[in-house]
Amino acid sequence: MPDSPTDLRSAFRSGRVTPTAGLAPGFAQTNLIAVPQDWAYDVLLFTQRNPKPCPVLDVGDAGSRTTMLAPGADITTDLPLYRVWKDGELADETADVSSLWRDDLVAFHIGCSFTFEHPVAAAGVPLRHVEQGSNVPMYVTDRECRPAGRVSGPMVVSMRPVPEHQVSLAAAISARMPAVHGGPVHIGDPTELGIADLGAPDFGDPVNLEPGDVPMFWACGVTPQAAVMASRLPFAITHAPGYMLITDTPDSEYVLEVPDAR
């Protein structure tokens, strides 16, 4: 498997389908949602009112297949897997949406927590889903996002089990990257988020907790997909959860510098 963003996007364009967690360490990854221009303002307002799960990194012009985050990339072919939505229902899952793209579609690129996984792992915190070769588990919570126009829906979270003695470290590192969801929204008991069973994620794969692990939950960029379903958008194209756009932007660009206290 190649490890540069350009080579990985080329592999996806050629038909390689794999979750992107752990790929291209050091480079940001993004969620994708493309909606008709008639819905774009409502979606933009929804993201602005809910910046924790929906931090916007780029918005394309209507019909554009490009993004400043990955010059030369085609966002209709260069993600490993997409979802196509009609009237809020999942209509298809495919590795290429170029034939479905429309001149009125506006693409939103939303920060992804895979981006902070590299610095978290570099600090010695294990990533269980990467160790186990699986997609990160994601759950629909009972926490409603702030609605915006015709768009509403619940917050989705991703979960990573972290050894108890490293919980504060993982929280501190991710908190310095608010453009990719920042610090966790909850630590510990999943029932406080309305999650009944960690072994049955709504998206992604279940992950085994090791003895001493504590579940940590981060706001997730799949939240707009939950809003698509709840709001019954007539048409939308999104990434498949866990199958992101790998950008050319270093993850270090999204780290907030801590002022010198001296």
From Swiss-Prot:
Gene Ontology molecular function terms on file: lyase activity
EC number from the UniProt entry: 4.2.1.-
Keyword Chloroplast part of the UniProt annotation: no
Keywords: Lyase
Recorded superkingdom: Bacteria
Catalytic class of the enzyme: lyase
Record carries keyword Lyase: yes
Protein family: Belongs to the D-glutamate cyclase family.
NCBIfam families in the record: PRK05463.1
Protein name from the UniProt record: Putative hydro-lyase ROP_32680
Organism of origin: Rhodococcus opacus (strain B4)
